[in-house]
Amino acid sequence: MSNMNTLDLKITNGRIVDGTGSPWYRGDVGIRGDRIVAIGDLSSTPAASTIDAQNRFVAPGFIDLLGWSQTTAIEYPQLEPKVRQGVTTEVAGEGTSPGPNRSDNLRAGERWATLGDFLDELDRRGAAINFAMLMGASNPREIVIGDMNRVPTAEEMREMERITDQAMREGAIGIGSSLIYVPAMYSTTEELIAISKVAAKYGGVYFSHIRDEGAKIDSALDEAFRIGREARIPVNVWHLKIGGRLYWGRMPEILAKIQAARAEGIDASANVYPYAASSTGLSTLAPDWAMEGGYDDFQKRLKNPEDRAKIAEALRAQVARRGDKGIYVTQIYGSPELDRYEKKYIEDIARDMNTTADEALMALFAQSMPSPRVIYFSISEDDVRTALQAPWISIGSDGGSPTPKQREENVAIHPRATGTFPRVLGHYAREEKLFTIEEAVRRMTSQAAARANLRDRGLLREGHVADIVVFDPDTIIDKSTFEDPHQPPVGVTDVVVNGTPVLRGGAMTGKLPGRSIRGAGYAGKRQQ
C-alpha cells in the first residue's frame, strides 16, 4: 500500500450531496490522510479501505452550531449520541467556556485556567468529533467582577479586553454570550461591544443567547444588531424562538427584522433546534435582581419575607406565560426527598405539595443545589416551521452528548441531544417537505461552517477536510422523545472525522480522531 496513488479510504457508489444545496449526483470520494483528494469515478483507484455507500447519501459531516459536549468529551470522548446523528464538529461556548477562569475557581475536568489549556488537553486526549470553542462572554466578567450587578470600571474593562485577546490568540473562534444567566445578564451592551471588538480584530464571530425571547425579543435583537454594527463582527442568534403563548405567531415579524438588519449590511443570522420546547435551569424564571450574587444568594433571598413575596409574584407571571403543562421538571440536585418530583409537571408537583405553583417552585429552589433542570413547553410548532424555512437559518442542537451512565439511569433530558439532525432531515425535509434534503444538508454544513468561520470544512470538495457522513435518505429519522429521550436515531451508517471512520456500518470504531479547531487568531501552530 505504499503506492502514492493509493487512497487511505474510498467511499464508493454514493449519491453525493456536496453541501452547496445542489442536487445529488453519483460518484466516489477519495481520502488520503485527513483530506479529500478526489471526487468522481474512482473505480480504478486502489484504496486501503472502502465504504460502499450504495443507495445512500454521502455528505459533509454535520456542524452543530450549539453543543454542550465539550467537557463531556474529556470523560467520555466517544460521544456516541452525537456521532450517530452525523455530527462531526460541535461549536460550544454559550455564555461560559471551560476557560479562562480564576485560579481559585478551577475544577478538574470542568474548568481550566485558560481556554488554551482546555483545547490542548482536548487535543492530547482526542475525541470522536471536533470542537470549535467560543470564549464565553461570562468568563472575563466573572474573573474580574464576579457575580455582582455593576458596570466595570475603565481598568476592569481593560482587563476583560486583555483576557479576551488572550483567548482569541489561544484559539477561540469568537465570543459566545448567554444574557439570561448570571453574571452575563448584568453585562452592558457597551461591555459586549468592547470584547467583541477584540474578537473581531482576529476574525472572530459573536454568537448570542439574546436577553429575551418573548415580550422583549425586539429590543434583544436590536442589542445583538448594535453589537454587530459597532464591533464590525458577524452575529448569530442562538436557538431563535418565540417563548410564551402570548407571543406565538410573531416569527414572520422576527425573521423580517433580522432580514432588515442583513439588508442594512449587518452580517446577521440565526440557528434553531427542531423542537417546540426548550430546556434550561429553573432559575431562569427568577427575576434578575433576585439572582445577583449567584444561586446561593438567591436561596438566601427566599428566606426574606419581603423578597420572597416579590419573587412569588414574578414566578406567578412566568407560570401564566407558559400555560398549563408548560413546565416539566427533569432533574433535581442534592435533595433525595425531592427526587419523586423529577419527570413531573409543576402543576402536578404543586398538587402533591398541596400548594400553589409559585410556592412549589420556591420549595424546589430552596432545596436543590444547583437549580433544578426543566423543559419549557412554551414554543409554537408553527413558529418552529416558519423559522426553519428562512434560508439563512442553520441548526444548533443546544444539547450535550449524554453519557452511557445517563442513558443507563434514564436521566431525563431534552431529545434534541440525541435527535436534532436526523429530525431535520427525516421529519422536516423528507416528510414535511419544508425544503429538500440537499438544502437541509447545506444548512448543517457549508452554511454552518461559514457562520463559525471554519475553513476547509462543510463541503465535499478536493482539498477540504474529510469530515463526512453517509446516511439513508429514505430512513433517516429521530427516535428520541420527551418520554424516552435516549433512543438513538436511525439512518446514519458511517461517519468519518478528519479522514478516520468513527462509525462504520452502524458500529462505533472506538477511534478518536477529533481535535480542536482553532480560530484565525491562534498564535501557535496553525490547525485546520
Residue ranges and their predicted role:
Residues 2-9, 16-61, 76, 478:
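Histidine-rich, glycine-flanked metal-binding segment
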Residues 14, 29, 34, 55, ...:
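Divalent metal-coordination and catalytic microenvironments
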Residues 16-28, 372-379, 383-384, 432-441, ...:
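Acidic, glycine-enriched loop/beta-strand segments at the rims
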Residues 44-45, 50-117:
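Metal-associated gating/positioning segment near the N- to mid-region
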Residues 74-79, 156-166, 220:
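Short, acidic/polar
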Residues 122, 128-154, 160-181, 196, ...:
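Active-site neighborhoods of metal-dependent hydrolases
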Residues 166-223:
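Divalent metal-binding pocket/active-site signature
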Residues 304, 386-392, 397-398, 413, ...:
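C-terminal cap of metal-dependent C-N hydrolases
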